[in-house]
Design a protein with these regions (language model features):
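Feature activates predominantly on carbohydrate-active enzymes
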Residues: 1-135
Length: 135
């Protein structure tokens, strides 16, 4: 496909082409735990990854800041959990999260394009949002 774009006339030069990846897992990790990444950007990344034959997209969905930046006070330290949770509705981050419906749609898009989504919920190390949850 890249050759046809380079030729400009949608024709391939005469010859044989072998096109296969050297590695079984060709991945990328996006950290949306520390900074919210809009769903539209995640969809764009899935499409771009499929184009470049990348097949594994790990999305980091929870994290917290360093307490040193918050006067060493865990109660004031920023934390985020980015997936909608019906069981614990107050758990999701106020500055952005993904609904179940839109995250499932992202997984379905990725599946159609040959990209596996690996949702990463990092515990116990980055679980401040979970430990501070109050109903």
């Amino acid at each position: 496909l890249q050759l046809t774009e380079q030729q400009g006339n949608q024709a391939l030069p005469k010859g044989a082409a072998r096109d296969y990846p050297d590695y079984a897992i060709r991945g990328f990790m996006m950290d949306s735990g520390r900074k919210f990444i809009p769903m539209s950007m995640l969809r764009d990344y899935v499409k771009m990854m499929a184009y470049y034959k990348m097949n594994t997209f790990q999305i980091h969905l929870n994290d917290n800041a360093f307490k040193q930046y918050y006067n060493h006070d865990w109660n004031k330290t920023y934390s985020a959990f980015r997936l909608e949770c019906e069981t614990f509705p107050g758990l999701t981050a106020r500055d952005g999260y993904y609904t179940k419906k839109e995250f499932i749609a992202l997984q379905q898009l990725a599946d159609r394009l040959g990209v596996e989504i690996i949702p990463e919920i990092d515990v116990p190390a980055h679980s401040l949002a979970l430990t501070q949850y109050k109903q």
